């Protein structure tokens, strides 16, 4: 039986593939699909964020797509912000 962390990791992979597979390339999340993903999957996070700038910031190799490693950088940003918010009184 998978642990809670293993389930969470598997869920991250599934979310990434749900959106990257829209264009048929499970290794690349293109801009329109990235926008759809972040507005659907983390609407609170992107309320005050310029999604175009976020995409450019995450696209470290400048190939106009977000690979899984670049996606994880966003997950870390969201996770850190969410953790910080959870400690606000």
From Swiss-Prot:
Ca(2+) 1 binds at residue 33. It is found in: Secreted; Cytoplasm; Cytoplasm, Cytoskeleton; Cell membrane. The keyword Calcium applies. The modification S-nitrosocysteine is found at residue 42. Zn(2+) binds at residues 17, 27, 83. Residues 13-48, 46-81 form the EF-hand domain. Calprotectin (S100A8/A9) activity on TLR4 signaling is inhibited by paquinimod. Pfam families: S_100. GO terms for molecular function: antioxidant activity; calcium ion binding. GO terms for biological process: apoptotic process; astrocyte development; autophagy; innate immune response; leukocyte migration involved in inflammatory response; neutrophil aggregation; neutrophil chemotaxis; peptide secretion. Disruption phenotype: Death at an early embryonic stage due to embryo resorption, starting about 8 days after fertilization. PROSITE patterns: EF_HAND_1 (PS00018), EF_HAND_2 (PS50222), S100_CABP (PS00303). InterPro entries: EF-hand-dom_pair, EF_Hand_1_Ca_BS, EF_hand_dom, S100/CaBP7/8-like_CS, S100_Ca-bd_sub. GO terms for cellular component: calprotectin complex; cytosol; extracellular space; intermediate filament cytoskeleton; plasma membrane; S100A8 complex. Keywords: Antimicrobial, Antioxidant, Apoptosis, Autophagy, Calcium, Cell membrane, Chemotaxis, Cytoplasm, Cytoskeleton, Immunity, Inflammatory response, Innate immunity, Membrane, Metal-binding, Repeat, S-nitrosylation, Secreted, Zinc. Ca(2+) 2 binds at residues 59, 61, 63, 70. It is a peripheral membrane protein. Homodimer. Preferentially exists as a heterodimer or heterotetramer with S100A9 known as calprotectin (S100A8/A9). Calprotectin (S100A8/9) interacts with CEACAM3 and tubulin filaments in a calcium-dependent manner. Heterotetrameric calprotectin (S100A8/A9) interacts with ANXA6 and associates with tubulin filaments in activated monocytes. S100A8 and calprotectin (S100A8/9) interact with NCF2/P67PHOX, RAC1 and RAC2. Calprotectin (S100A8/9) interacts with CYBA and CYBB. S100A8 interacts with AGER, ATP2A2 and with the heterodimeric complex formed by TLR4 and LY96. S100A8 is a calcium- and zinc-binding protein which plays a prominent role in the regulation of inflammatory processes and immune response. It can induce neutrophil chemotaxis and adhesion. Predominantly found as calprotectin (S100A8/A9) which has a wide plethora of intra- and extracellular functions. The intracellular functions include: facilitating leukocyte arachidonic acid trafficking and metabolism, modulation of the tubulin-dependent cytoskeleton during migration of phagocytes and activation of the neutrophilic NADPH-oxidase. (Microbial infection) Upon infection by murine coronavirus (MHV-A59), induces expansion of aberrant immature neutrophils in a TLR4-dependent manner. This is Protein S100-A8. It comes from Mus musculus. The lineage of its organism: Eukaryota, Metazoa, Chordata, Craniata, Vertebrata. The gene is S100a8.
């Amino acid at each position: 039986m998978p642990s809670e962390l293993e389930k969470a990791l598997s869920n991250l992979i599934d979310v990434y593939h749900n959106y990257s597979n829209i264009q048929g390339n499970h290794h690349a999340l293109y801009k329109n699909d990235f926008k759809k993903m972040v507005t659907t999957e983390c609407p609170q996070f992107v309320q005050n964020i310029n999604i175009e700038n976020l995409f450019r910031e995450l696209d470290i190799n400048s190939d106009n797509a977000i690979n899984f490693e670049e996606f994880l950088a966003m997950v870390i940003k969201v996770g850190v912000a969410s953790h910080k918010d959870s400690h606000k009184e």
